[in-house]
A protein has these predicted regions:
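C-terminal structural segments of small proteins and small subunits
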Residues: 63-91
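Short S/T/G/P-rich N-terminal loop/turn motif that feeds into the first structured element of a domain
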Residues: 1-54, 61-67, 71, 94-96
Length: 96
């Protein structure tokens, strides 16, 4: 079974306190579902459109696990804590 990844790009952080509250709740929810944070932070170097934005890469054992964790009660609580604190782009990508 192919691995799957959450790729999350933060276009804008509007409220660092809400982001901190989200981080406190989201990491345990992600880890409980078998997610592993592979990378997080601001890009070291950007090409193409040149956007040096915060990016997070999380690995799961399968697409099903990635979606289940996103839809879980615990992760949804983390998203509620984030609220309008950030503008993000999040996607689930299947590994090859």
């Amino acid at each position: 079974m192919a691995k799957a990844y959450w790729v999350v790009c933060y276009r804008e952080i509007k409220d660092p306190n809400k982001l901190a509250a989200y981080a406190k709740l989201s990491l345990p929810a992600i880890q409980a579902g078998g997610g592993r944070v592979l990378a997080r932070g601001t890009a070291v170097k950007a090409y193409e459109s040149g956007q040096l934005e915060r990016t997070v890469l999380i690995e799961f054992d399968s697409v099903e696990h990635a979606i289940t964790v996103h839809d879980s009660r615990a992760y949804q609580e983390a998203l509620k804590a984030l609220g309008d604190g950030a503008v993000r782009d999040m996607r689930v990508v299947a590994g090859s």
